[in-house]
A protein has these predicted regions:
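Start-transfer (signal-anchor) and selected internal transmembrane alpha helices
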Residues: 1-35, 124-130
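Transmembrane-helix motifs of polytopic, lipid-linked glycan transferases
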Residues: 18, 105-130
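Hydrophobic alpha-helical transmembrane segments
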Residues: 18-22, 81, 134-136
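Extracytosolic helix-loop segments that constitute the early lumenal/periplasmic catalytic or substrate-binding loops
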Residues: 43-74, 78, 88-95
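Mobile, glycine-rich extracellular loop/lid and propeptide segments
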Residues: 76-78, 82, 115-118
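Juxtamembrane loop-transmembrane helix junctions in multi-pass integral membrane proteins
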Residues: 98-105, 148
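Multi-pass, polyprenyl lipid-linked donor-dependent membrane glycosyltransferases
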Residues: 109-113, 135-139, 143-162
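Specific aromatic-rich, kink-prone transmembrane helix
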Residues: 120-124, 156-169
Length: 169
């Protein structure tokens, strides 16, 4: 028999009661503030910031025309758009205070938002396995290392894939 999933808003409300969730937030926020993954510093964030400074061209051709590294952002438009809002806010703050920190912070926050979205989707679909999902996904050393230490953006296509599967269900 088909089971209807609870709305994400209800899952979100219940999630805030979980101490494991709070522990994961503390760990991940500490890493967001303390770490600067090289791949983000040298490739991803400069690529996006370059487009803010000259948004006339497509991001990839504009970056190459400005002398950027061809390996800088090997992702498509959806990945670019996913990082755009929070990185733009950070870039605006950087320009206001004449620093170079908040664009990087904004980029990392976009990954954190997607991480929470993916957690919500998993909790929504696998309603009877909350504790396991919180331990094995939310506190997974592998996920934390790949996303927050190494700085990869692979959570975005994974979250989109899982979301599309929930729509099929």
């Amino acid at each position: 028999m088909h089971q209807v999933c609870r709305p994400l808003g209800l899952v979100w409300t219940d999630l805030f009661r979980e101490k494991i969730f709070h522990l994961g937030i503390l760990i991940k926020f500490f890493l967001i503030i303390a770490l600067f993954p090289v791949i983000q510093l040298e490739w991803f964030v400069p690529f996006i910031v370059n487009w803010f400074e000259g948004p006339k061209n497509l991001p990839w051709s504009g970056y190459l025309l400005s002398g950027g590294d061809p390996l800088a952002f090997p992702y498509g438009l959806i990945m670019f758009i996913a990082h755009l809002p929070t990185t733009a806010i950070g870039w605006a703050i950087d320009n206001f205070f004449a620093v170079e920190y908040f664009a990087h912070f904004g980029f990392k926050i976009s990954l954190f938002i997607v991480d929470i979205f993916l957690l919500l989707l998993l909790l929504q679909v696998f309603e009877n396995h909350w504790r396991k999902i919180l331990i094995y996904y939310w506190l997974s050393p592998l996920g934390i290392f790949i996303t927050y230490w190494h700085g990869q953006s692979d959570l975005i296509p994974v979250a989109l894939f899982i979301y599309s599967l929930t729509l099929i269900k």
